[in-house]
Amino acid sequence: MSDALLADARRALEHMPAVLEALLSGLDHEAARTRPAPNEWSPVEIICHLRDEETEDFGARVRVILEGAAEFVKIDPERWAVERGYQEASLPEALAGFRARRQDSLRLLASAPSELLRALGASRPLGRLGPLSGLDLVAAWVAHDRIHLAQLAGALARNWASRWAPLRSEYAGPIPYPTSV
């Protein structure tokens, strides 16, 4: 990844908290906790996931590479959602936590020598992916943000359409993500 691409990735990571705050501004307590389907996350669960992934997945894994540690720690985000009570969390507090953790992550990336980010990661590969460089993780970090941004937008659109039934919203076009997964 060139320095220009790394700079683009840092900017994308920097903008994510403001994008989320704008998207979720004014969302009431009920809407923050509405799951578009029983096996899908609500908006507050998505934000809690992003907050915790910030330091326990992407940030932690970049640190492993920068510090030359031996391996990545195993994570279980699905378990975190239940054990940490994501569904009952405060959306404003989760957003603030995400923003603070993202600022810490951006400071870490700003101080990281690019040659260390380019180095291949832990001596034990990450599952089927094999060894990863810090730059691989930065690219995945941006993709992860965007995957969950799309998930959040789809959840909000589907929840909105359900909440306002029997009004018909199909004139807007197809709502992202089918109601049955």
Q: Could you tell me what each predicted segment is?
A:
Residues 1, 78-86, 125-128:
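A short small-residue
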Residues 2-30, 53-67:
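Alpha-helical bundle segments that constitute or directly flank the non-heme di-iron/ferroxidase center
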Residues 3-13, 40, 91-95, 135-138:
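Amphipathic, non-membrane alpha-helical segments in soluble helical-bundle scaffolds
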Residues 4, 27, 41, 86-89, ...:
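Short coil/turn linker and secondary-structure boundary residues
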Residues 16, 21-23, 79-120, 136-151:
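Acidic/histidine-rich alpha-helical segments that form the ligand environment
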Residues 23-30, 69-72, 112-115, 155:
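A short secondary-structure junction motif
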Residues 30-35, 92-95:
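Short helix-to-loop capping/linker segments positioned immediately adjacent to catalytic or ligand/cofactor-binding
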Residues 33-77, 120-181:
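Short, contiguous alpha-helical
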